[in-house]
A protein has these predicted regions:
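Conserved donor NDP-sugar-binding/catalytic core segment of glycosyltransferases
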Residues: 51-92
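A recurrent flexible, glycine/aromatic-enriched loop bordering the glycosyltransferase active site
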Residues: 22, 90-124
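Glycine-rich, basic loop-to-helix element that forms the pyrophosphate-binding segment
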Residues: 14-32
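Catalytic beta-strand/loop signature of glycosyltransferases that borders the donor
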Residues: 69, 159-165
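The conserved acidic donor/metal-binding loop of glycosyltransferases
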Residues: 41-45, 69
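Acidic donor-binding loop at a coil-to-helix junction in glycosyltransferase catalytic cores
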Residues: 141-148
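Short aromatic/hydrophobic "clamp" motif used to bind/position activated sugar donors
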Residues: 37
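Acidic donor-binding segment of Leloir-type glycosyltransferases
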Residues: 1-15
Length: 185
């Protein structure tokens, strides 16, 4: 069982103005005081066993970065990418409805360097490793995750947790649908 002392919980507001997601993620991660940094989008959900699974993964001192499978829900409906590109799926129940668990690709230079196949979420770094590789690039308005995942793979020891630990909600406000998506593609 993993417990968090809520007296240690804190929110550090970002006082600047920026359009660079890399700057915001770097600020948030460097403000954290824990040993493991877990990336969670404000509009997504962690599964109830997520924190315990991450704690088990990072109990191995050799692990610098861990990532899991995820479930993508597109405007409230189950979502799947075309399996002809190598995507694999398993049934996954969430919030009383049948969804699909997207099985993340195994760690490799190809999967970590191409944003289409890179680990989605949950993603977690050992804090000292995150700092050692320079964290998120504050100059990045998009593709900050492709950049940091490439550096993570090159310099770190990676663990894929073969369980769905993250529910990703795709909607009109995501960058995967917004004006920046054409640049990302």
């Amino acid at each position: 069982e993993v417990r968090v002392d809520l007296t240690q919980a804190r929110v550090v507001p970002y006082s600047g103005q920026t359009r660079n997601i890399g700057e915001l993620k770097r600020f948030a991660c460097l403000a954290c005081r824990g040993d493991v940094l877990v990336e969670v989008d404000h509009d997504d959900e962690l599964t109830p066993d997520c924190v315990a699974e991450l704690a088990a993964a990072f109990a191995d001192p050799r692990v610098d970065f861990a990532y899991s499978n995820c479930c993508e829900i597109n405007d409230g409906k189950p979502w799947r990418y075309d399996e002809k590109y190598g995507w694999r799926y398993r049934p996954f129940a969430w919030d009383g409805q049948q969804q699909w668990e997207c099985v993340a690709f195994d760690p490799s230079p190809a999967s970590f360097s191409k944003i289409w196949f890179a680990p989605n979420h949950v993603r977690a770094w050992r804090a000292n490793f995150y700092r050692r590789i320079g964290g998120h690039d504050p100059s990045r308005a998009v593709l900050d995750d492709q950049d940091i995942l490439s550096r993570t793979y090159i310099h770190g020891r990676v663990k894929h947790i073969d369980r769905c630990l993250y529910v990703y909600h795709v909607h009109a406000g995501n960058t995967c649908r917004g004006e920046q998506n054409s640049f990302i593609q």
